């Protein structure tokens, strides 16, 4: 049996995926980061500071909530929700930014940069930068700046410089391109806080490790509440950090099924989606080999999702590996299904999820009725939906005005 905790290998590979495909300029910085992380990941003082920040600044552990009404309505499995939406800054993203900010501080760099799609990673990075007194620059696609005006204002309030990226599709991919360019130019003074389990090694590993607090807590909580492990885990996948954070501590438990939910946009058959694990090809993007949305010549094609946070043409290399190994099943949910998931959770449980998380909720409505009533699903509510109210209101034909 495969021991999934042994990945990545020493060169950052998950099977054929991962690795470090970057310019020579960045090699030394990545090797320094890898060496620093390898020293710190078992350092008692570093881990104690990380745990202290998660407890007293973020508010962890996040609750594991039994969604009783929703479970009864769907008539199948019992549904538990991991409430990452209740973290400080409103999503799972802060788990990673706290860890990386501590690494940045140890590396002596005073300037941090980040890319962001929905704005949640940008907000989390700007928040930690404010707390540590670091200069912060956030790159965000111009299209996403329009979609997520509230988060842009939050970042600026926190003291960050937000740079709208006008190139390409003006979304997350382009923001990451610009962040990488900035890093190449300013590598000696700047630490790049990558927001997901993508990018060159060691980022997929260290982001996973920081986010795995989600699954470690959920594992303990479900055993306390139900006396056993769950039968299924469900989480949305863009780059895939919230999903790998939930999945990783369960990967060696063969009886626990796992479902990663990709953004099918207007539908897989239309080509207007963000589902590389369902309809992509292996290629190299942002420093790692993984499944990508690309044409037959290997060129990246434009993606679409109602969700800015899932609107990305790649995916973390560990997810690509888990697909190849048939350990995780990756399923598509389109924009309309995600909107219904958003409405269902809001109306039935009084929890307004992020549109990203709503993709996972939509899949729960399909999965739960196919399971027995004594079975258990844990679904990750990766973020809260305040940032998406304008988007949903527009779809509903409601004009939001200032009071």
Swiss-Prot record:
Residue numbers bearing the N6-(pyridoxal phosphate)lysine modification: 93
Metabolic or biological pathway, per its Swiss-Prot or TrEMBL entry: Amino-acid biosynthesis; L-tryptophan biosynthesis; L-tryptophan from chorismate: step 5/5
Subunit structure, as described in the record: Tetramer of two alpha and two beta chains.
Cofactor: pyridoxal 5'-phosphate
UniProt GO cellular component terms: cytoplasm
Organism: Acinetobacter calcoaceticus
Swiss-Prot/TrEMBL keywords: Amino-acid biosynthesis, Aromatic amino acid biosynthesis, Lyase, Pyridoxal phosphate, Tryptophan biosynthesis
Role according to the record: The beta subunit is responsible for the synthesis of L-tryptophan from indole and L-serine.
InterPro entries the UniProt entry points to: Trp_synth_b_CS, Trp_synth_beta, Trp_synth_beta/beta-like, TrpB-like_PALP, TrpB-like_PALP_sf
CDD domains xref list: Trp-synth_B (cd06446)
Catalytic reactions of this protein: (1S,2R)-1-C-(indol-3-yl)glycerol 3-phosphate + L-serine = D-glyceraldehyde 3-phosphate + L-tryptophan + H2O
Known EC number: 4.2.1.20
Protein known as: Tryptophan synthase beta chain
Keyword Amino-acid biosynthesis: yes
Root EC class: lyase
Keyword Cell division: no
Pfam families associated with the record: PALP
GO MF, any single term: tryptophan synthase activity
Gene: trpB
UniProt record similarity statement: Belongs to the TrpB family.
